[in-house]
Amino acid sequence: MEPTYCSRRHHQGKDKGKEVLDRKRQVLHLVTQWTTLYRDFLREDEHVKLFMKTLYRFLLDDLYEYPTLEKEQKDLQKLLRLHRRHTAEEYSPHRKSKALSHQLSLKENGLPTRRTQRETREVLCHVYVSMDSYLSVRSLASVVAQGLLQEVAERLDVPLEELVLLAVTYPGEKLLLKPQDRLYSDSLTAVGRLHVCRKDLSEVMNPFTDNAELQQRSARMLSMNTWDVAVTLTNFDWSVFNSVHEQELVYFTFSRHASGGHTVALELLLQRCNEVQLWVMTEVLMCPTLCNRVQLIKKFIKIAAHCKAQRNLNAFFAIVMGLNTAAVSRLSQTWEKVPGKLKKVFLELEMLTDPSLNHKAYRDAFRKTKTPKIPFLPLLLKDITFIHEGNKTFLDNLVNFEKLHMIADTVRLIRHCQEDHMGNGMPQKSSPEVQAYVDYLHVIDNQQTLFELSHRLEPRV
């Protein structure tokens, strides 16, 4: 792009000069649109920053010969957040030496640094508190061991001084983390699987299958209002979804193994979807009494319906899938006692998750849902992956723009879902008690443990 902008082709006369000016304008317009659309992603790329500086330098050089480019210069200046105002007169040949020093001093303090961007990103920390369960803690990526340990201690009601934080690396090595150790790298890779232990390295709590106290936790869930739970789930999801940029879907699909931290919000929402599904399973399977288990299933059906009403299809899918997993759906004695009216409601909700005809039921319902709304992201990613893998990016050494247009149309759905032209609004006021519970989900992620609990509740005949 730089050679295209800089090329003068030794033009002669007015027509050639106008042609060069038009070409420069076209390049600057393209760069401005590109930078405006993908600003946050581009600002973290050192190559892009260097390119933008170089282009701006060339533009400043051209101001004397093409003073009508001053509007484009101001637009680019705003994008770079330069504090100093440059004018065409300032870049005349007589002031070239002084100009050069200013050209090379684009105000770096106007550009967010990688560290600043990193420190404002959020992650879901999975902190294992037993062999088969973890506590989910939403935190900044800049969190240190002491800060995370303090949050976990408060949630578990265990004195902080009794706990330590371990990171278990891929080879199985256990690292004892110091209070000020950072838990995430610049690319948001965790130092390892995080475990909270007592100082003698014993477990903080027994496994769920042997923990009588944890098996009484259903009482807390049963006391909560279903609408409040749905509101809290939606507020959490919306706060993340509203920060998802459509470019994240492209990074996730095209360069999943080298995203460089560019898919943080998207991965957070996908992680949350999986977490909510596990939470539904955990709550039902940790309830030892039949009558309470029936009440829990009734509550989750209502919460799923409320999430749908609140236009949160991501949480809606997660709850329905959680109730439909083999470990929960096999509890025939429990499902038999669910009232017929609620069974009918659940059947209608299930129909929306039916994958037949390429999820036609969901797509039709979602199309009719007003914005803002949260889509079921795994399906959206599946659509993009299908386009990407089913079509070549290059045909006869030329870019396949038809493929790129199809991907663009699909990812543009993110922006559409985030729009709120009618003032419908997504976040609502939630109960502090419910928020404290839902924002820190304690779930079992071990499928063997979940099935063991299921068969313990209703043994195979």
Question: Can you say where each PLM-predicted feature lies in the sequence?
Answer:
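Intrinsically disordered, low-complexity regions enriched in proline, serine, glycine
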Residues: 1, 12, 38-46, 68, ...
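Residue-level signature of the C-terminal ends
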Residues: 4, 33-41, 45, 58, ...
